[in-house]
Amino acid sequence: MATKIDKEACRTAYNLVRDDSSAVIWVTFKYDGSTIVPGEQGAEYQDFIQQCTDDVRLFAFVRFTTGDAMSKRSKFALITWIGENVSGLQRAKTGTDKTLVKEVVQNFAKEFVISDRKELEEDFIKNELKKAGGANYDAQTE
């Protein structure tokens, strides 16, 4: 059966993360049968990491505060998590299903496809977002 997405519910969750006045910094999009729906959400990145277990595949939209001493700003990441115990067929479908998620999640600085929990470390993701952000003025700090 072809995968579908609940666009309205997913868009609501996506906008919650994009809203700087919201405490929610991440949301997952998971499978409910053959439909992608919003999953968990939260204000702590470590809580998101707990969702990424070996037997699940999910998509996540995460807000990080990056920048240097001169300018702090929000950067967004689209993370595709595929656990080690996910079957080959489901792994393959995840790649094509991501196009549905991208119909909703359209603004992000960098995209990650991760199956190793070490790559979920906050410092690793922030460093990659910093590289994607262009100019770095950290050398000007005293």
Swiss-Prot record:
One Pfam family linked to the record: Cofilin_ADF
Modified residues (N6-acetyllysine): K102, K126
Record's keyword annotation contains Repeat: no
Residue ranges of domain ADF-H in the record: 2-130
Modified residues (N-acetylalanine): A2
GO function terms (MF aspect): actin filament binding
Gene3D superfamilies per the UniProt record, alphabetical: Severin
Protein name per Swiss-Prot or TrEMBL: Coactosin-like protein
Organism this protein belongs to: Bos taurus (Bovine)
